[in-house]
Amino acid sequence: MFGRHSIIPNNQIGTASASAGEDHVSASATSGHIPYDDMEEIPHPDSIYGAASDLIPDGSQLVAHRSDGSELLVSRPPEGANQLTISFRGQVYVFDAVGADKVDAVLSLLGGSTELAPGPQVMELAQQQNHMPVVEYQSRCSLPQRAQSLDRFRKKRNARCFEKKVRYGVRQEVALRMARNKGQFTSSKMTDGAYNSGTDQDSAQDDAHPEISCTHCGISSKCTPMMRRGPSGPRTLCNACGLFWANRGTLRDLSKKTEENQLALMKPDDGGSVADAANNLNTEAASVEEHTSMVSLANGDNSNLLGDH
């Protein structure tokens, strides 16, 4: 019933000319709509309880149904008239030849009650959100209940998962307290390999430790990148000997290093001779052997003598 009759806007309901008066009467009889001759008869939404009652036939009763964004009046005259009058937001529509069975079918479809009270029958039609688009009005935002609901929602949204959030100020404070090495975060416990040369921090660390020599090859701690752990404890081997010990579990053979040095010294330069190279080789070998013997005697370990190897 309601699907076949569309809502007529206010600008289409007006006064007809005298020459077309009969055409309007015949058209209204065919379509079921009864036009009104004066726009002032159409009630305004603000005065829907006053002016709309003048347009309803005598003997009918009005019940206004107010929902969110809807103002609807449904009226049926006494028995035998079979005329349905609907007033919605200032527009009045009258439908003829509307039986009670059609009204019951529409109400059952919209979820209304199908039981009609005796006497003047007045029905309320509620706007269903599932069947009709809901129109949002600005007046809803001004309601105090709406404002309180929005306030509760904002508070709940701000408090959601608050324990999992870490503020940036706290993270920055923790980052400032952490130890850094060349801009990178490092552990608070300094490792054995944290002493490098070439920076002020490394120089200060080198000054804190006295100069020592490798217990295996006798090189000074200032001539190696870092001192490493050996069989005698930490900082007892140079970088080369410590890496060899950590990878293979044995100390490296210094005789191979001596042979390499000999071959390098035996190669004559442009302005030298083979005899000069041999003399230099003997001098270097004697100095290395003497230095190694002194280091071994100082550490009390006679097994590290060059002759034993």
Swiss-Prot record:
What tissues has this protein been observed in?
A: Predominantly expressed in shoot apices, inflorescences and roots.
SUPFAM superfamilies associated with the record: Glucocorticoid receptor-like (DNA-binding domain)
SMART domains linked: TIFY (SM00979), ZnF_GATA (SM00401)
* Gene Ontology annotations of biological process type: regulation of DNA-templated transcription
What InterPro entries does the annotation carry?
CCT_domain (IPR010402), TIFY-like (IPR045280), Tify_dom (IPR010399), Znf_GATA (IPR000679), Znf_NHR/GATA (IPR013088)
User: For this UniProt entry, which residues form the secretion signal?
Assistant: none
List cellular component terms (GO): nucleus
Q: Which protein are we looking at?
A: GATA transcription factor 25
The species this protein was found in: Arabidopsis thaliana (Mouse-ear cress)
